[in-house]
Amino acid sequence: MTAQIIDGKAIAQSIRTKLSEKVTARKEAGQRVPGLAVILVGADPASQVYVGSKRKACEEVGFISRSYDLETNCSEDELLSLIDSLNDDPTIDGILVQLPLPAHIEDSKVIERIRPDKDVDGFHPYNVGRLAQRIPVLRSCTPMGIMTLIKSTGVDTYGLDAVVVGASNIVGRPMTLELLLAGCTTTTCHRFTKNLEQKIRQADLVVVAVGKPGFIPGEWIKPGAIVIDVGINRLDNGTLVGDVQYEAAAQNASFITPVPGGVGPMTIASLLENTLYAAEQYHD
C-alpha cells in the first residue's frame, strides 16, 4: 500500500479562493471588509517568516491587514495597551500576537487580554472552553485546519481510534478535543507516556506534533491508518522534514500529509476563515 498524499497547499488555496469571493460579495453589498491585526514582538527569524506569510495571505483574499512590529525589549504594558486599542477598533475583526513572546512577557496574560470575539488564533480560555463543551466558535487554527484535511479524505471519523502525539496548548490539547467532537476514541501521548509504539500501532489516525525530526518510525504506522504530520524541522543540510519518518510511513498509511505542504498552509487558511467568521458573526 502506498498512501495518498493529502495536499494541504491545494486545499488551502481552494479555501483562500472561496474567501476572496466572499470578500468581493461583501464589498458589492456595501459591507465592511474584514480586518486582521498581526503583532510581532522582536525579530525571531522563524516568527518573521510566519508573520510575513499571514500578512501576505490576508492581502491575497482582500482583508485589511494591519502590522505592528514591536521591539524585543518593549514592555508588557506597552503590548497590552496596543491590544486594548485594537479591541476597541471597529475596523479590526481579528487580533493575532505571534508566539513565542520574549521571556519578560507572560503569554497567558497577552492571550487573555485579546477579546474572545477577536481571538482568531482560538487560544483564549473562553474559546478553548467552548470547544471542550462541544459548542465551538473561534477554533485553534492548526487543529481546525487538520480537521479540514481529514474531512477531505472522505473517511468517516466516527469510531476511529485516534492518537495525538504532543500535548501543547497550541496543537495537542485542542486537537484532542476536535477529534472527540468528530467521534474518535482519542488518546493523547506526551513525554510521560509509556508504550508509545504500542499505542501508535493500534491507531487508525495519528496526529504528531512534537517538533523532533523523524521521531515516529514509519513501520509503527498501522496499515491503512491516516497520518497527519504537524512537525516542520530543518535539518543541518537545509532539508525540511516532519516528525514522522515519511517514506516508511507512506508505505503503510492510506493517507498522509507531506512536509512541507501539508498542515502548514492550512493553519493560515483557518486563520483567515476565523477572521471572516468573526466579522460575520460578531461584528457586522
UniProtKB/Swiss-Prot annotation:
CDD domains reported in the protein's UniProt record: NAD_bind_m-THF_DH_Cyclohyd
NADP keyword on record: yes
PROSITE patterns: THF_DHG_CYH_1, THF_DHG_CYH_2
Gene Ontology CC, one term: cytosol
Catalytic reactions on record: (6R)-5,10-methylene-5,6,7,8-tetrahydrofolate + NADP(+) = (6R)-5,10-methenyltetrahydrofolate + NADPH; (6R)-5,10-methenyltetrahydrofolate + H2O = (6R)-10-formyltetrahydrofolate + H(+)
Domain of life (superkingdom): Bacteria
Residue numbers binding NADP(+): G166, A167, S168, I232
GO biological process, one term: L-histidine biosynthetic process
Keyword Oxidoreductase: yes
Biological or metabolic pathway of the protein: One-carbon metabolism; tetrahydrofolate interconversion
Keywords linked to the UniProt accession: Amino-acid biosynthesis, Histidine biosynthesis, Hydrolase, Methionine biosynthesis, Multifunctional enzyme, NADP, One-carbon metabolism, Oxidoreductase, Purine biosynthesis
EC number(s) on file: 1.5.1.5, 3.5.4.9
One family name in Pfam for this protein: THF_DHG_CYH_C
Molecular function via GO: methenyltetrahydrofolate cyclohydrolase activity; methylenetetrahydrofolate dehydrogenase (NADP+) activity
Family from the record: Belongs to the tetrahydrofolate dehydrogenase/cyclohydrolase family.
Function: Catalyzes the oxidation of 5,10-methylenetetrahydrofolate to 5,10-methenyltetrahydrofolate and then the hydrolysis of 5,10-methenyltetrahydrofolate to 10-formyltetrahydrofolate.
NCBIfam families: PRK10792.1, PRK14186.1
Subunit structure: Homodimer.
PANTHER family xref list: C-1-TETRAHYDROFOLATE SYNTHASE, CYTOPLASMIC, C-1-TETRAHYDROFOLATE SYNTHASE, CYTOPLASMIC-RELATED
Protein name in the entry: Bifunctional protein FolD
